[in-house]
Amino acid sequence: MAELNEILGNERIKEHFITAVRHKNISHAYIMEGDKGSGKKMLAEAFAKILQCEGREITGLVESCGKCESCIQMEHHDHPDVIWVSHEKPNVISVGEIREQIVNTVEIMPYKGPYKIYIVDEAEKMNAAAQNAILKTIEEPPEYAVIFLLTTNRGAFLDTILSRCILLATRPVPGTAVEKYLVEKCSVSKEEAEFAAGFSLGNIGKAEAIVSSEEFRDLKDLTLSILRYIHEIESYEIADKVKEYKKYKNRIDDFFDIFLMWFRDICY
């Protein structure tokens, strides 16, 4: 897992966390909003690693040491006091799941760390009953409890939850930084990196996903081959190529995004 200072972009969120650690002013509840792939999980996990680090108490630094038992457990995603809340149904987090995984366990002291940290990904999927269940914990948390609600849409939360959480929003990473990262870390060509940076609109997770996807690469090549030579090829050839899109029916949004990006580049 990445250290906080290794995460690309979102400097304001990283500085917020560093300042909170430096001044020992950790909130009990955070809402982190951003698109899928924008780094919410990485940021929450890196902050959790700093909070649980045993070596930090010795060094006095505001970053994790990477060597203590807590840091090693975080690296292996098995720290007993960092709980990722799961849900069975894909589109809803139920009141039962919130009660079982948070409400009924939060009063149990941390096993070893100074904090007991709960991370709820896709938290916008909590139904009203689940939100009301977690609200009491947010309102009256144990001193050691920290809750992260990661979401693509803060508007899905009750006003009472919004008013009691620190609100943080991820931001797009500059295109040049994304390109540099992809070339250096993912070993792709400058041309591929430039396309991925533009296509992802600064979403580093999305950019990484598309440069590593052979299916996306094939879809991109097919789409661009039509767009680049549409004025030269016959109508029956276009029809044949369109038939090839059947195997990409689950990536129709990507097709339209490639299409729009092509015309955006032409116009601007």
Indicate residue ranges for each PLM-predicted region:
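A short beta-strand-to-loop transition that corresponds to the Sensor-1 phosphate-sensing loop
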Residues: 122, 149-154
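Clamp-loader machinery-focused feature within the broader ASCE/P-loop NTPase space
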Residues: 2-129
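Conserved catalytic/switch belt of AAA+ P-loop NTPases
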Residues: 132-149
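Charged, glycine-rich active-site and insertion segments that engage polyanionic ligands
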Residues: 1-50, 58, 73, 143-145, ...
